[in-house]
Every structure is written in structure tokens, then in C-alpha cells.
């Protein structure tokens, strides 16, 4: 008597319904990571364009396009790493690695999404499109081997945040402030080093099995680098609040932008607490969304900054002259 073989779970996963394919593609695009792209709105805030409807629409378009740029990187990396990911318990459940989403379908999605994203980016601003291309090239360089180069790996992680800030300024056609560049880069290095610190604390002697470059980072080295970057981040932001020439004239005179410094200090200290005491820090965007005190602090900083910039800017219509 013959029995009919039942398809295995993995075989079933390889034949998703047509309705589930868009959801699987979306999952592979990592929408949780899109929160990083909020940094594209920094130029809108600090260039005093947050009441300009045209600038707001351009910033929203830039946000959406950068989400697509980063998502295409995730799709391509998951296609390339599908065999390796299928053997790793941490990544085996990803749609492509598990077989739930055929890699050919994912490749087709990239073939459609990426050209459209570049065309729309070019129409928004050619320089914005160039930054998008540089961002993708940076991510591919990281994925294809540069992530194994000590120190450079951290700079590449951090550069993604700097490129986002630059792209946001280009999208709304405002000058790129030297303070935006310096503070963003130092803050991004702070997050990147804490990511490495978290991995070393969490994995201990097995850290190199997770990421080979971790063999090159001793706890003492990470501590020294973090000390330098943390102090530099606080100092650079503090200097910005009372020396930046792109602040509205009244704020340059009354120095009230310094009221935002405590929020930055608390945010940095809270993040260090979460890394050292709670073993978090592997994903900055998830930490921000999950930790209520840090989220509240970020919102208060943004609201306070926007309020001060608006009240003391010409767009408020308030005359602060003698």
C-alpha cells in the first residue's frame, strides 16, 4: 500500500500565496529600521523650514525614498546571504532564508523598486540621488568585507547617519551646516561604538564567532574610544547651542538654546545605562522605541528645540529687537 508523501514545513514555506508575497517582501525590507531615517528631518528643523509646506513635502518625500534605498540594500543582502542565513538560528526565519519568499521574487522587487527610487530621487534633487547612491555603495562595501576591518567598520556604521542628515538638507535645498555634520557624526560614532560594546558584553569570549572583527576590539579599547566620543559629542553639541552662527540672531545673543543641553546629557547617560546595565544597544532604533524614558527625552528635546527656534526666528513675526 502506497502512502502519499506530505510536503515538509519548508516546502510549504516555499509556496506562499500570492496575497502573502507583498507582506513577505515588506518584512524583508525591515520597516523597523526606517526609524533611522527620521534624521532626514534635522535640516528641516534647524534650517527653520518647519513651517514651509513645500520644504515639509520634500522632506517627507526624501524620508520615503531613503527608506526604499535602505530596503533595497536589505533585500540584496538577504538574497546574497540566503544559504548562510538558513544555517544560523538568528537569521533562519527570515523570509528568503527560510524559503517563504523565493529569492527570484525578491530580486524582481529590487529590479522594480531601485530604478524608480533613483529616478524619483533625481527629480527631487540630483545631489540627493548621489547621496543615496553613496549610501548604498557604503552599505555594500560594509557587507562585502569592510565590516571585518577594525575601526573602519565603526566609521562605516556611523557614516550612514551622517549621510542621512546630509541627504535631508539637500532634499530641501538648504546649506549643510558644519554643526550638523560634526554633531551627527560624533553622535553616530557614539551609537556605533556602543553597538560593538553591547556585542562584546553579551557574547563574551564567543563574540568573534558572531562577528570576526570583535576579536580586534578589547573591552579596554572600546572603553577608551567611547570616553573620547562621548565627551566630544557632549562638547560639540554644547558649543553649537551658544556659538553657531546659523541660529536666529536672538538665540545667538540670549543663549537660550543651551536649555536643550540637559536633554542631550540625559539621553546619552540613559543610553549608556541601557548598554551597560540592561545589555541593550544592538539596535539603536529599537532601543529608542522600546525605552520610554529615552523616547520621552527625545520628544522633549525636539519640542524644546523647535519651540525656541520658532519663537526667536523671523518666521514667528515677533520683534525681539530693542
PLM features: what roles do these ranges have?
Residues 82, 87-132, 178-189, 223-234, ...:
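Multi-pass membrane catalytic core of lipid/isoprenoid biosynthesis enzymes
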Amino acid at each position: 500500500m502506497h502512502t502519499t508523501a506530505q510536503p515538509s514545513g519548508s516546502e510549504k514555506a516555499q509556496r506562499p500565496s500570492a496575497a502573502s508575497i507583498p507582506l513577505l517582501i515588506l518584512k524583508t525590507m525591515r520597516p523597523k529600521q526606517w526609524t533611522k531615517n527620521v534624521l532626514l528631518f534635522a535640516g528641516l528643523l534647524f534650517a527653520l523650514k518647519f513651517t514651509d509646506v513645500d520644504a515639509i513635502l520634500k522632506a517627507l518625500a526624501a524620508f520615503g525614498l531613503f527608506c526604499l534605498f535602505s530596503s533595497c540594500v536589505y533585500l540584496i543582502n538577504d538574497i546574497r546571504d540566503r544559504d548562510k542565513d538558513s544555517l544560523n538560528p538568528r537569521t533562519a526565519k527570515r523570509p528568503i532564508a527560510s524559503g517563504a519568499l523565493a529569492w527570484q521574487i525578491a530580486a524582481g522587487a529590487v529590479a522594480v523598486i531601485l530604478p524608480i527610487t533613483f529616478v524619483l530621487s533625481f527629480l527631487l534633487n540630483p545631489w540627493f540621488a548621489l547621496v543615496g547612491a553613496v549610501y548604498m555603495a557604503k552599505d555594500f562595501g560594509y557587507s562585502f568585507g569592510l565590516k571585518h576591518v577594525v575601526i573602519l567598520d565603526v566609521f562605516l556604521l556611523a557614516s550612514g547617519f551622517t549621510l542621512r542628515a546630509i541627504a535631508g538638507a539637500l532634499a530641501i535645498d538648504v546649506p549643510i551646516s558644519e554643526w550638523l555634520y560634526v554633531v551627527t557624526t560624533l553622535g553616530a560614532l557614539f551609537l556605533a561604538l556602543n553597538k560593538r560594546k553591547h556585542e562584546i558584553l553579551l557574547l563574551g569570549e564567543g563574540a568573534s564567532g558572531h562577528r570576526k572583527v570583535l576579536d580586534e576590539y578589547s573591552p579596554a579599547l572600546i572603553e577608551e574610544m567611547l570616553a573620547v566620543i562621548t565627551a566630544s559629542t557632549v562638547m560639540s553639541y554644547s558649543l553649537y547651542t551658544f556659538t553657531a552662527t546659523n541660529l536666529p540672531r536672538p538665540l545667538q545673543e540670549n543663549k537660550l538654546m543651551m536649555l536643550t543641553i540637559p536633554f542631550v546629557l540625559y539621553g546619552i547617560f540613559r543610553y549608556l545605562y541601557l548598554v551597560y546595565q540592561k545589555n541593550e544597544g544592538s539596535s539603536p532604533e529599537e532601543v529608542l522605541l522600546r525605552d520610554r524614558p529615552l523616547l520621552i527625552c527625545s520628544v522633549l528635546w525636539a519640542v524644546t528645540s523647535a519651540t525656541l527656534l520658532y519663537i526667536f526666528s523671523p518666521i514667528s513675526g515677533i520683534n525681539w529687537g530693542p
